[in-house]
Design a protein with these regions (language model features):
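Active-site beta->alpha loop and helix N-cap motifs at the rims of alpha/beta catalytic domains
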Residues: 35, 42, 46, 63-150, ...
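Alpha/beta catalytic cores of nucleotide-metabolism and tRNA/nucleoside-modifying enzymes
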Residues: 1-6, 213-233, 239-286
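Catalytic cores of alpha/beta
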Residues: 33-42, 104-113, 174-184, 237-254
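C-terminal helical cap(s) of enzyme catalytic domains, especially alpha/beta-barrels
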Residues: 59-70, 133-134, 201-212, 262-286
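Glycine-rich phosphate-binding active-site loops on the catalytic face of alpha/beta enzymes
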Residues: 46-58, 117-133, 186-202, 251-275
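Short beta-strand/loop segments at the ligand-binding rim of alpha/beta enzyme cores
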Residues: 12-27, 87-99, 158-170, 219-237
Length: 286
């Protein structure tokens, strides 16, 4: 089979049309081909792939990708090529979330490999230094070792300016968000308000929905100051259900949302658990 390719120009034109029409842009993470196929059929605009999504699809928490137990970029490239691309019809574009701090990779070659398989969008969240608390000892150690947000900004700029790819920035803090938008000028920027709550592997603490909307809107305002044309989407924290996303749309000035666990891990857990339990509860009538 041959999956239809979507050019960068077509992706950007489609995004502009939705922004102009005030239609929410939806980005969805997928850790398996089945989930990606279902998301595309449902109408998502972008399927993003990253090692955390693949780990989630196998029952681990997203944060497993933060430990040096796998080659994050190789995991992402392999399952994107083998599981995701063959499952799609070409309606949704694919964004590969990459680790720009990989010391064993020339990111030009990684980005070129993405393009060769038909992926014309890249993000810095695979994982990102922005995950790590800047007051922590591990952040200081990482910085001294050259593992920095600077490399992520460089990759996003290179993807957009040199590789003609759609660049999708993501940050967890106002400081990182401003830097990424101001220096990398990504086509799309996602403010990550924190780990998604709920489910078997979800985070039980975090912000309320109202707090999520407030901090997201604050980030949007700061990002627009340095990059007025950026497309802004929300993600994380209390954004778990469709009604939560609706609240974010109604109470922020962004252009859409990015779903992760909300449209893959959580519905899979719920549906499979119920179906399996219904079968497991069967008994002989005689």
């Amino acid at each position: 089979m041959i999956t239809k390719r979507i050019s960068t120009e077509t992706i950007l034109a489609n995004l502009k049309r939705k922004v102009d029409a005030r239609e929410p842009i939806m980005i969805s993470s997928a850790g398996s081909g089945l989930v990606a196929k279902l998301q595309e059929a449902a109408g998502t605009d972008c399927i993003n792939t990253f090692s955390g999504a693949r780990l989630r699809a196998n029952g681990m928490g997203t944060m497993s990708m933060m430990w040096p137990i796998l080659d994050s970029n190789r995991q992402t490239l392999n399952y994107t090529r083998e599981d995701i691309m063959p499952a799609l019809d070409g309606k949704a574009f694919v964004c590969a979330c990459l680790n720009a701090n990989d010391p064993l990779k020339d990111m030009h070659m990684v980005l070129q490999e993405c393009k060769d398989m038909g992926v014309n969008a890249a993000s810095n969240i695979g994982p990102s230094v922005s995950y790590v608390d800047k007051d922590s000892e591990i952040f200081k150690v990482m910085s001294s070792a050259g593992i920095t947000i600077d490399n992520e900004i460089e990759m996003l700029k290179y993807a957009r300016e040199e590789m003609n790819m759609v660049s999708v920035g993501l940050g967890f803090t106002l400081e990182d968000s401003i830097r990424i938008c101001g220096e990398a000028k990504p086509h799309i920027f996602c403010f990550h308000a924190g780990t998604t709550q709920g489910g078997l592997k979800g985070y039980s603490g975090g912000m309320t929905l109202e707090e999520t909307a407030a901090v997201t809107e604050e980030a949007y305002a700061k990002c627009r100051e340095v990059h007025p044309d950026v497309i802004l989407v929300a993600h994380g924290a209390a954004l778990e259900k469709p009604e939560d996303a609706q609240y974010i749309l109604d109470n922020t000035s962004g252009h859409g949302f990015w779903t992760g666990s909300s449209t893959e891990r959580l519905p899979v857990e719920q549906a499979v658990s119920k179906a399996a339990k219904d079968f497991a509860d069967l008994r002989f009538s005689k």
